[in-house]
């Protein structure tokens, strides 16, 4: 179940609150609260600060995530985002488990409901000794949208 409330402030600012409740057989009950702040920089560019907290049944505490993205529409059917984020947990203490930077290229192709994304990223997770090592990843996503 999902609830979303969006509040624009003038032409350039927007605040969005999203609450998501899930029940899955393995993870059981999960609740995520998200708060986004957006500022339109130009007609085709905006900056977004996203914040999440998630509680999952059977875990001690919450996981959290905060990040900033710069999103730009390149053409009518393509866009790119530059992202940075960090996330962690609040138990036994508030800690940062991982840092991330990435770029996502998104393009609509062939049909209005078909998209692909290419996303390289670098993360710096904390290992058991507390050290951070670079981890590189590349994701390719195919998205099919149903409905309007």
Language-model region placement:
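Residues that define the transmembrane beta-barrel architecture of outer-membrane proteins
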Residues: 1, 27-33, 60-66, 86, ...
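Aromatic-anchored, glycine/proline-accented short structural segments
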Residues: 20-64, 68-70
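Membrane-embedded beta-strand positions of outer-membrane beta-barrel proteins
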Residues: 15-19, 33, 45-51, 66, ...
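Outer-membrane beta-barrel "beta-signal"
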Residues: 109, 133-148
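Residues on the lipid-exposed face of transmembrane beta-strands in outer-membrane beta-barrel proteins
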Residues: 3-7, 21, 33-39, 66-72, ...
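Structured C-terminal portions of repeat-based eukaryotic scaffold domains
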Residues: 64-89, 94, 99-103, 107-109
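Sequence/structural signature of outer-membrane beta-barrel proteins
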Residues: 4-10, 18-28, 52-60, 77, ...
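Outer-membrane beta-barrel channels and translocator barrels
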Residues: 6-12, 38-44, 71-79, 110-112, ...
